Amino acid sequence: MYRSSNPVLRNQAFAGQTVGQEQMTVNGTINKILTLFMCILFGALVTWAVAESNPGLAILLTGVGGFGGFIMCLVIIFSRPAQPGTMMGIYAILEGFFLGGFTLIMESMYPGIAMQAGMGTICVFGVMFMIYRFEIIKPTERFMIGVSSAMGAVFLIYLLSFFLSFAGMGIPFLHSSGPVGILISLVFIGIAALMLIVDFGVIEAGVKNKAPASMEWWGAFGLTITLIWVYIEMVRLISKLRNN
């Protein structure tokens, strides 16, 4: 059985199907991924449309999307609904609100950055998929534990930075545009890219183990979260580079 330390893609959920259930497929998982990205696009378009007439409301939507998406993500992970499609769709729309506002703000400061970050994200996805396909990096249990631990460390760093900001403080170099700040962004992108290997591996294992079809949503959910992370880190890196 394929083992995973990823809290979104728990290994026992992908262990196999019971008699009579539809089973997980690659095409089904791709369809779920496309569905979630359509929800993200819808949320982003709503924020962009609102920003044209009411910038203040667009900023509110961005905040609601960011906070609400984070809470919804935690609810989904810890409640483990048997049919998670609706909740994951809501999560994706909330993330769309946030990403739409985030992209507008960054685009106003750095024209063209959205396209650059989008292309960068696609390139990272493509490269990591090829690395996975040719088994240059294999998602072994030790690899997955290491990458998931690194991801958790990044999350704690950002969470600490968020709380410190209320006291007018911050983590040194995290948001700086100097060499150290750029290196930090590169490391974070590297960790996010390695998480794609984990996502690919768990999805493939779910298909091979004939996991229930509902697991397609979980595979799509994990991959979507990782791609959102890659995009945000790519925007941060490009903004730092363009500040120099």
Name what the model sees in each region:
Residues 1-244:
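A hydrophobic alpha-helical transmembrane-helix feature that marks the membrane cores
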